[in-house]
Amino acid sequence: MIEALETFQLIGEAKEKMGKPLLEPREVNRVIFVGDTHTAIDVTQTVFDKFYGDADLVVFLGDYVDRGNTGVENLGLIASKFLEDPNKIIMLRGNHESPLTNPYYGFLEEVTEKLGEASYDSFKEFFQAMPYAVVVNNYLCLHGGIATTLDTVSQIADLPFPDLNPDDPIGFQLLWNDPRDMIEGFLPSVRGDGAYYYGSDVTEKFLANNSLKGIIRGHEVVDGFREDLDGKVITIFSSKYHGGAAGVLILDGDKMEQVRL
């Protein structure tokens, strides 16, 4: 298994290959989408053992740390694969890649115990270098969802960056917002100030305006998968701390397959 000190070195190298909020669109044949792993290094290793070899691209949707005690090693494992082939691995940012959550859900304590508190600065630098989003095969991939003032995908490329918390409202909402059936527009979320639920009408408008098929995201605890807003939004959850299944989504040409681990 990747050691903590090795992770410290890997994230420094990986950071230099990131550094912009929106990645270039990708068109590939076989894609593996991985949701929140939250320190579940066993799930991450299974993804690489079972699916990586046949894939053209693996997209991680954020939330690698917190809610467990192997977040450092989980980050290191993914970063090591990313450095082997940066064109085959995408590491998107989640809301738990932030000092807004790490002091409360375990990652700051984990880093302090394994590497010393001062080393957390390097993880913060890594987190703020992570991209928010990428369009893959005409699906918008990100952690949370669309934002109240986001009209086009191209706006993401112009967001303030790096933005550690993030403080920009759009950047924050990309990581924190959730889809909800039976609502219209945007409604304040129980997650707190600045976070919103988005409904089917604004989602359909955004997808149509940007010629997108749908949204693939993480962020919510589900039993592997959930489809919302008439299937336009797919949520993937790839950890097992909640006692349910970990899911990965495979997009192979026009065929979409949900696999529970």
Language model: regions and residue ranges:
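Feature recognizes metal-dependent phosphohydrolase scaffolds
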Residues: 1-261
